[in-house]
């Protein structure tokens, strides 16, 4: 049975119970869905093409900085103005174009630290306004990353926001524990390795608090994962995810194989296939992939410019003749497309590694 058979909406942006149904299907069939950070219509297209061509669902997400970029670097971000407008603009663009690709898309937003909560508030306001008109939120889901705060404050704020989100049937992703490296608004590059691991008890305390509100939430716990790519990384321990599931199952009087938690793998760039498979087998349903995609997008454009440099120095004049026009070489639709193709290729690799490929067949 293909994944689309469990969804009421087969293509385009899915919301509410469909998001849970997709994650349930992924957990049961032991695959994870790549979450691709998008910053422009071009990166959106690259991700959608890869998913369509590999018959896979996909998660598209905007970060705080990525959303501001989507709005335009010339727009002031005072009061999170650009980030709010950019994320909403991206959401409407993705909603309009995603059905053309014939695949289900989860529309998500990435890390929101406490200092960025005005951004979250602006998006949630847009969700509620959209819900009033259409009976569903604008975004499928949002992420709160309050891992810099105490666990008590982290969970308390998540409960506060999730109570509001549940009223519009929206999924919440939260982070507990510290993921190393740097991601929009959260910098943990100086964190010692021993702090990069969450305990089963802490993870379950999140489940205990949020499950009273709605089952529609996932947990990004720390198991040595790091944002970005570094020469020396922390010791990744995906087997810890199994202990989180086992502890939760025991507390809930369920079988260990039930894997009651929806888990998320942050800092996926640069990890091994073995680590991904171990994490997915323990209930990871979403893997964030940003840094690798950024480099892949650059590589296509970089290689094009290097290979065609003799055609890009002047509007007219190249090795074929001093009067030969170069417009077909410097047209942005040509060289930007090269970045889309290499980014799409990198996402295709992820779809294969995460076992997502063919999930819609």
UniProtKB/Swiss-Prot annotation:
Protein name from the UniProt record: Fructose-bisphosphate aldolase
Annotated GO CC locations = cytosol
Q: Name one GO biological process term.
A: gluconeogenesis
Instruction: List its EC numbers.
Output: 4.1.2.13
Q: How is the cofactor bound?
A: Binds 2 Zn(2+) ions per subunit. One is catalytic and the other provides a structural contribution.
As for what it does, the entry says: Catalyzes the aldol condensation of dihydroxyacetone phosphate (DHAP or glycerone-phosphate) with glyceraldehyde 3-phosphate (G3P) to form fructose 1,6-bisphosphate (FBP) in gluconeogenesis and the reverse reaction in glycolysis.
**What is the catalytic activity of this protein?**
beta-D-fructose 1,6-bisphosphate = D-glyceraldehyde 3-phosphate + dihydroxyacetone phosphate
